[in-house]
Amino acid sequence: MYLTICLKCIDYKCLDLAIILKIKQEKNHMKVITISRVYGAGGHSIGKKVAEALGIEFYDKDIIKETALAMGIDPELIKAAEEHITKGDTLLRAISPISYDYKNTIFNYERNAIVKIASQGPCVILGRCAGEILQEEGIDCLNVFLFADSIHCGKRVGEILNTTDVNVIAREIKKQNSSRNAYYTRYTGKHLMDSQNWHMTLDTGVLGFDTCAKIICDAVR
């Protein structure tokens, strides 16, 4: 016996609704993805690829905007504070309207912004100790760390800085990685590049950006 399907009899509106509901259900079961990385490993690019593939939001600079809004100050001041948070108190004393424990104040506002964003549904969050923060809050997440060797990182950083000077590139990589690790250690008590802190670590130089993005997507689907 053969089953003949009449295309005219298919209710495409119901079919479309079923597809939409399936997508919504998949999103509801999806974890929040946090991505941390060494400088030059391509975290921003891969994070955006993952978010686009999964149809969810990607957050990086948005956290700065959310924090600045909550604190009532210019987002550029939050950005400057992030960059100098491990380098001393002078800048933060000058820009912060809050007189008590200004370093921790900025971090706590960012923490609140991260929790608020993650509570709204599946998304990709870049950096800022998001994985540790969400785990402490009991929010289900997949914490990913991206790395690459000095050759791959150096090539990418050279493109970012628009330079081929290997000394300039090496200094910038060392500075950024040192700053990121100091920030992470300050607020988590852990080492950024310790693989035990992450659910998944990926070598972006060996695997490539597209493959890394696919692996992350497959892990949360």
Task: Report each predicted region and the residues it spans.
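Small-molecule kinase domains that catalyze NTP-dependent phosphoryl transfer to phosphate-bearing small molecules
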Residues: 85-93, 165-210
